[in-house]
Structure formats: C-alpha cells, structure tokens
C-alpha cells in the first residue's frame, strides 16, 4: 500500500518537479514504517480523513479507529509533514458539539487544513443520509474552523 503511494509521488515529481502534491492516505493501521514511506516521498500535503465524529466512527468506518486516525495525523506532523489535512462528512447523525470536538482534536494533533462536506449515500447498502446540511450551517463551521486556526 504505502509503497505505491510513495512511488506515485516520486513518479509525478520526476515528470513534473513543480507539481504540488497532495496525498490522501488510509491509516495504514498506524504502522510507522508505512507512514515514513509517505513522509520520505515528501508531498506538500498529506491528507488522512477522519470521515466522521468519534461517536459514529465505528458505524461509518468499520476498520478504522478515531484515535488511531488522530495518531496518524500527529505522527505525520511530528515527523516532518509539511502540511496535514483531514475531512469529515456531515448528515449522518453527528451533533454540533461533536463536530466542534473533532475540530479541536484535529488542531491538537497539528492538523492545519480541514474540510467538511455533505455525506451522500453511495448505495442502498450504505448508511442513510439523515440530514442535508444547509449552506448557512457550512458557513458557520467555516468561520469556526478559521477561528480555531484551520486554513
């Protein structure tokens, strides 16, 4: 897994050294040697999505763990990542205070960029959309995120 990500970054650099690179990686189960491969490839942004709030992680991300994802982002930042990025989806039953807690958790591990988007159900086999979040609510979270130091 991580070898392919790192080789892809290096291949793009060889073809176009001026390309800004962002990688969106899985947690690699928190295995440091896999994370180090990504760090050694040196993309400008390393992204690993939390996907949801702590309470819903087990339901939404069957193989992932909330704290392991935070640990991955922290490890990346502490070991030389230029910028780290993460994102969550809304509309699956999360509460405002849980979203704010996730923002705080991400800032605590040094994450600089956060995206928040609307969850859209890919198929009937996936969890249903419980709410379509309004643009005004997204604007509110954007303002809060900027106040918390996200770019």
Task: Pin down the residues of each PLM region.
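Generic structural signal for helix capping and beta-alpha/helix-loop junctions
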Residues: 31, 55, 123-124
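Hydrophobic residues within beta-strands of alpha/beta enzymes
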Residues: 1, 46-48, 114
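Auxiliary Fe-S-binding modules of radical SAM enzymes
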Residues: 10-18, 40-41, 64-151
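Canonical radical SAM enzyme core domain
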Residues: 2-38, 52, 90-98
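Glycine-rich phosphate-binding active-site loops on the catalytic face of alpha/beta enzymes
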Residues: 50, 54, 116-119
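A structural motif
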Residues: 40-43, 47, 51
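Active-site-adjacent beta->alpha loops and helix N-cap segments on the catalytic face
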Residues: 2-8, 55-71
């Amino acid at each position: 897994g991580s070898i392919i990500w790192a080789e892809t970054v290096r291949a793009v650099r060889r073809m176009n050294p001026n390309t800004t690179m962002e990688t969106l990686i899985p947690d690699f189960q928190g295995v440091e040697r896999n994370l180090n491969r990504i760090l050694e490839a040196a993309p400008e942004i390393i992204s690993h999505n939390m996907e949801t709030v702590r309470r819903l992680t087990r339901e939404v991300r069957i193989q992932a763990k909330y704290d392991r994802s935070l640990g991955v982002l922290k490890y990346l930042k502490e070991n030389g990542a230029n910028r780290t990025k993460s994102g969550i989806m809304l509309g699956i039953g999360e509460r405002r205070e849980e979203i704010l807690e996730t923002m705080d958790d991400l800032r605590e591990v040094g994450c600089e960029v956060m995206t928040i988007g609307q969850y859209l159900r890919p198929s009937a086999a996936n969890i249903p959309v419980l709410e379509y979040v309004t643009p005004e609510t997204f604007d509110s979270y954007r303002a809060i995120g900027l106040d918390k130091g996200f770019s």
